[in-house]
């Protein structure tokens, strides 16, 4: 017995030609949470520089991660399409964001603040890191409401979900596995892993508490950032085994996804940062 995707409207309300969507709303509440939690952390840790500059820092990182996320998606996932459809780069309502691109954008912004205010970049990233998982989780809820980024076909998994808008991809699966035709006829779509919810739990909830409890004690500079890179990379690589690869890319060499390739350097960088934080004098 499979689970049917609930009837969720991705649009909150519409006024004239303008529609407010849940996905965009998730970005808003993520930023508001980051602003609130960031100020709370700055007061608790008595980081005077952060108290004075936190709003500018967070606004800049939010903007940098959004721009980086868009550019990252274009370069990493669909460069051939956007190189021939340049105006589509600005059609952000059509979707297309990359966490890894957003991370690069955030790092560029933090590097600027590090240079301007004579702070170590890892001091800044250690402050920012606990604010990230909430946004990751909220974003995946937005993906779920949009019924996008669903997982791979899993007919033997009892809690697989039927996503009605996966039919185009399902037809490609039928060509490879004709035995799935009966399931398609019966349910209207093939059962898939609800990987948005997996990511919500691992990258949103679990990662938040890992970073939260780790950062409650005084830690060496860089260790919080390193821990985040390691666990996000591990969680993302794990989930990619269940997530449907982007159709325009598929499995690279029929083995690995682009998300896994981009996450592996995060783990390596996290391990190096952790080692230097604790052992390099």
UniProtKB/Swiss-Prot annotation:
Q: Which residues cross the membrane?
A: 11-31, 57-77, 89-109, 194-214, 222-242, 255-275
Please state the Enzyme Commission number of this protein: 2.5.1.145
Annotated Gene Ontology cellular component terms: plasma membrane
* Pfam families membership: LGT
Q: Name one GO molecular function term.
A: phosphatidylglycerol-prolipoprotein diacylglyceryl transferase activity
**Mode of membrane association:** Multi-pass membrane protein
Q: Where in the cell is it found?
A: Cell inner membrane
Identify the domain of life.
Answer: Bacteria
**Keywords, ordered alphabetically:** Cell inner membrane, Cell membrane, Membrane, Transferase, Transmembrane, Transmembrane helix
The record, for PROSITE patterns, names: LGT
Q: What Gene Ontology terms for biological process does this UniProt record contain?
A: lipoprotein biosynthetic process
Q: In which pathway does it act?
A: Protein modification; lipoprotein biosynthesis (diacylglyceryl transfer)
**Which InterPro entries does the protein's record reference?**
Lgt
Keyword hit for Kinase: no
Ligand binding (a 1,2-diacyl-sn-glycero-3-phospho-(1'-sn-glycerol)): 140
Query: What does this protein do, in the record's words?
Result: Catalyzes the transfer of the diacylglyceryl group from phosphatidylglycerol to the sulfhydryl group of the N-terminal cysteine of a prolipoprotein, the first step in the formation of mature lipoproteins.
Q: Which family does it belong to?
A: Belongs to the Lgt family.
Q: What is this protein called?
A: Phosphatidylglycerol--prolipoprotein diacylglyceryl transferase
What organism is listed for this UniProt entry?
Buchnera aphidicola subsp. Acyrthosiphon pisum (strain APS)
Q: Which gene encodes it?
A: lgt
């Amino acid at each position: 017995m499979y689970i049917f995707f609930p009837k969720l409207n991705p649009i909150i309300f519409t006024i004239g030609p303008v529609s407010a969507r849940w996905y965009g709303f998730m970005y808003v509440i993520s930023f508001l949470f980051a602003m609130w939690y960031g100020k709370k952390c700055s007061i608790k840790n008595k980081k005077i520089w952060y108290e004075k500059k936190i709003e500018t820092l967070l606004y800049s990182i939010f903007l940098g991660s959004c721009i980086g996320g868009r550019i990252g998606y274009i370069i990493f996932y669909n460069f051939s399409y956007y190189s021939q459809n340049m105006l589509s780069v600005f059609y952000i309502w059509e979707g297309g964001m990359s966490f890894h691109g957003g991370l690069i954008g955030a790092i560029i912004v933090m590097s600027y603040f590090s240079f301007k205010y004579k702070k170590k970049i890892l001091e800044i990233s250690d402050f920012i890191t606990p604010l990230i998982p909430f946004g990751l989780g909220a974003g995946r809820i937005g993906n779920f409401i949009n019924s996008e980024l669903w997982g791979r076909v899993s007919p033997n998994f009892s809690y697989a979900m039927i996503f009605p808008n996966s039919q185009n991809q399902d037809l490609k699966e039928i060509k490879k596995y004709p035995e799935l035709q009966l399931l398609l006829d019966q349910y209207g779509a093939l059962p898939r892993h609800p990987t948005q919810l997996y990511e919500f739990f691992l990258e949103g909830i679990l990662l938040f508490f890992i970073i939260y409890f780790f950062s409650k004690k005084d830690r060496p500079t860089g260790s919080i950032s390193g821990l985040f890179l390691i666990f996000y990379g591990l969680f993302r690589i794990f989930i990619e085994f269940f997530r449907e690869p982007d159709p325009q890319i598929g499995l690279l060499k029929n083995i690995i996804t682009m998300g896994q390739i981009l996450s592996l350097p995060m783990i390596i960088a996290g391990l190096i940062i952790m080692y230097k934080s604790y052992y390099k004098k």
